Amino acid sequence: ILNTILTNESIDVIVGNINKVLKVIKGSSFLIENNSHCIKWPGSKIAENKFSNSICRKTESKIILDIPNMLADARNFGFDPKKYIKGLDVDSVSMIHIAGGDWLDGYKENKITRGHFKKVEEEVWDLLQDVFLHHVPRYVTLERSRNINIEEIIDELKKLRTICH
């Protein structure tokens, strides 16, 4: 979900847009992914996980939970990432993205994570384990776009397999 004001009015607009797409692409499903944000829009009235839940319920869509993005937002805006995960509807999380990257300066003191070119940090692994306590995603994607180190990736895939099974 792009950085938007988290209100019921925004939900209505997004739901309408998703339903238009689904009418054209019949028989398809729709996935929404959380982004990391440098700012929180004034006027937001709903927590992002509740916002996503509402969209999913109204459109039968599912969530791609990008754990590094969620972790960036938790650090930036002071919420508990485990409560965020637990607050997502049980059957809503279809896919997980994990990656390692750099923490970059965002707006004011806030940080964003960018890049898929480093090892996954331990806090992301811990949160992935927490996801599996509450959800059964169909897919987990380990993202790596450069600094390809085969041994490192194999180790991460082994760790991923252990967590997922």
Residue ranges and their predicted role:
Residues 5-11, 73-136:
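Gly/Pro-rich active-site loop or hairpin
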Residues 1-62:
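Active-site acidic/histidine proton-transfer and metal-coordination neighborhood
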Residues 35-37, 68-72, 99-103, 145-147:
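Active-site beta-loop-alpha junctions enriched in small/polar residues
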Residues 127-151:
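Long hydrophobic alpha-helical segments typical of transmembrane helices together
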Residues 30-33, 63-65, 94-98, 138-142:
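Hydrophobic faces of well-ordered beta-strands that scaffold small-molecule active sites
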Residues 147-165:
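C-terminal helical cap(s) of enzyme catalytic domains, especially alpha/beta-barrels
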Residues 40-57, 73-86, 153-154:
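Distinct, well-ordered alpha-helical segments
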